């Protein structure tokens, strides 16, 4: 039975006990968040979500408006332990175009500068590797967020990042305009990722 459900016996027993006692396990909460993200991004069709049950990560794929339509994969990994933070977002891209690679790197650096200037509280950690931009995800500690609120915050953030990155790469917005759009979106959001 555990094998059919894509898990092991120990995890299955834990889940059965949690269901029986009406306790939401960290694993179930992560799965609920991913289901909610899937529902939130599906109508826009800019991001294609994918996640497998009983995993702590999901991916969202997006196509760039560029010569050969390269894809960007957003990988959201959530931690079960709140003390480690919420999780991390990795933006993974593969391209042979030196120009596109340079433009994406410039955007990632711009994004970090914007967040450094406008986020208060816990500062996220960033890393930029060949073909990968990583950012930690946290929520302000002043509130116990529901799965729906967390999913909304993550989906809003990824959609904003994707929309502004595509616009930047297409030359539609200058860095000051990207910053203004970022700030306007931050003011509208109920839960702000930090």
Regions found by a protein language model. Name each.
Residues 15-17, 40-42, 119-120:
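Short, surface-exposed, polar/charged, turn-prone segments marking secondary-structure boundaries
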Residues 7-30:
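Short, basic amphipathic alpha-helical segments that act as recognition/interaction helices
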Residues 3, 7, 25, 188-194:
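Terminal, compositionally biased segments
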Residues 94-194:
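Charged, low-complexity intrinsically disordered regulatory/assembly segments
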Residues 22-55:
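Short, positively charged interaction helices/loops
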Residues 48-101:
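Amphipathic, interaction-prone secondary-structure segments
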Residues 1-2, 17:
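Short amphipathic alpha-helix starts
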């Amino acid at each position: 039975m555990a094998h059919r459900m894509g898990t092991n016996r120990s995890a299955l027993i834990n889940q059965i006990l949690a269901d029986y006692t009406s306790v939401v396990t960290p694993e179930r909460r992560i799965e609920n968040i991913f289901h909610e993200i899937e529902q939130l991004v599906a109508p826009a069709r800019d991001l294609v979500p994918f996640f497998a049950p009983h995993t702590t990560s999901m991916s969202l794929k997006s196509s760039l408006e560029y010569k050969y339509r390269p894809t960007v994969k957003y990988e959201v990994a959530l931690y079960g332990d709140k003390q480690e933070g919420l999780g991390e977002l990795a933006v993974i891209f593969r391209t042979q175009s030196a120009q596109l690679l340079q433009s994406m790197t410039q955007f990632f650096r711009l994004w970090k500068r914007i967040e450094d200037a406008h986020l208060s509280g816990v500062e996220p950690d960033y890393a930029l590797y060949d073909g990968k931009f990583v950012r930690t995800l946290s929520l302000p500690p002043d509130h116990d967020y529901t799965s729906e609120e967390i999913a909304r915050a993550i989906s809003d953030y990824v959609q904003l990042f994707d929309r502004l990155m595509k616009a930047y790469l297409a030359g539609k917005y200058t860095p000051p305009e990207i910053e203004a759009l970022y700030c306007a979106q931050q003011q509208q959001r109920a839960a702000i990722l930090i």
